[in-house]
C-alpha cells in the first residue's frame, strides 16, 4: 500500500481501513501462533500499513489544527484592525 494513496483518502475511510488492517493483523498473528501460516512476512507488511494509515491520520489532524489556529488568528487581526 503506497503512502500517497493513503494520504488522499478521507478520515472516515482511513478509520475504516485501520479497523480492517487490525482485524487482518489479529488473524495473521493467530494463524502464526497455531502454525497455520506459511508466509510470516505478511505480519510485518500489515503492521507497516497500519503505521502508514495512522501517520496519515495524525498528519490530517495536525493540518486541521493549524488551519483552525490560522482562522482564529485572522479573526483576531481583523478585530484589532477595527478597533484601531
Swiss-Prot record:
InterPro entries: Ribosomal_protein_uL29, Ribosomal_uL29, Ribosomal_uL29_sf. GO terms for cellular component: cytosolic large ribosomal subunit. Gene3D superfamilies: 1.10.287.310. One of its GO terms (molecular function) is structural constituent of ribosome. Pfam families: Ribosomal_L29. GO terms for biological process: translation. Keywords: Ribonucleoprotein, Ribosomal protein. SUPFAM superfamilies: Ribosomal protein L29 (L29p). PANTHER family: 60S RIBOSOMAL PROTEIN L35/50S RIBOSOMAL PROTEIN L29, LARGE RIBOSOMAL SUBUNIT PROTEIN UL29C. Belongs to the universal ribosomal protein uL29 family. This is Large ribosomal subunit protein uL29. The lineage of its organism: Bacteria, Bacillati, Mycoplasmatota, Mycoplasmoidales, Metamycoplasmataceae.
